[in-house]
Amino acid sequence: MGSVGLLYVGAVLFVNGLMLLGTVPVRSASVLNLFVGALQCVVPTVMLIQAQGDSSAVLAASGLYLFGFTYLYVGISNLAGFEPEGIGWFSLFVACAALVYSFLSFTVSNDPVFGVIWLAWAALWTLFFLVLGLGRENLSRFTGWAAILLSQPTCTVPAFLILTGNFHTTPAVAAGWAGALLVLLGLAKILAAPKAAVPQPRPVFN
């Protein structure tokens, strides 16, 4: 069930990346944040009800609230005109929690691929903290591109693989996933770099 919510997290991360780049207006992006945030609160609640005390099911559901609260916070704050610092510092909490979930994926859940994915989310939410919490606006373009490029391989792609029964998690697959995500972060840095000014020809006067 969690994979259904993960599918739409890929969509909202993509849109939020475009919002950071100034391509999508803030209020327009807020609507999708509210939809996905609500979904990511309902889905884990249903999972907890169905878990019947199964610790692994409870663990799987608990992390989804991090996304639900993030997107509800973003949607409400943007529509109400709140300052971004609150979201930024909450993002620091999410980043720290993601490190714990990554460790648990490697050690308890025996899921190295999601261990890598949680590390990617930790890095991304750290960027959100720097931009929104500390006002590091010079990182906005890099963060926007990082959100766009990481949204699909960390959310949409694994969601579809799980939904179709084609998700496999081994150390070798996790290593490949990690390499691909690092390449995408490098690409985000390149895309975020300021474009060099094109020299204009000097006018010639007779």
UniProtKB/Swiss-Prot annotation:
Keywords per UniProt: Cell membrane, Membrane, Transmembrane, Transmembrane helix, Transport
Domain of life of the source: Bacteria
Presence of keyword Cell division: no
Localization, UniProt: Cell membrane
Protein's name in the database: Putative transporter protein AmiS2
Membrane-protein topology: Multi-pass membrane protein
CDD domains per UniProt: UreI_AmiS_like_2
GO cellular component, one term: plasma membrane
Pfam families tied to this protein: AmiS_UreI
Presence of keyword Oxidoreductase: no
Gene responsible for this protein: amiS2
Native source species: Rhodococcus erythropolis (Arthrobacter picolinophilus)
Major localization class: membrane
Listed transmembrane segments: 4-24, 29-49, 56-76, 86-106, 113-133, 142-162, 173-193
Protein family membership: Belongs to the AmiS/UreI family.
Role played: Possible transporter that might be responsible for the adsorption of amidase substrates or release of their hydrolysis products.
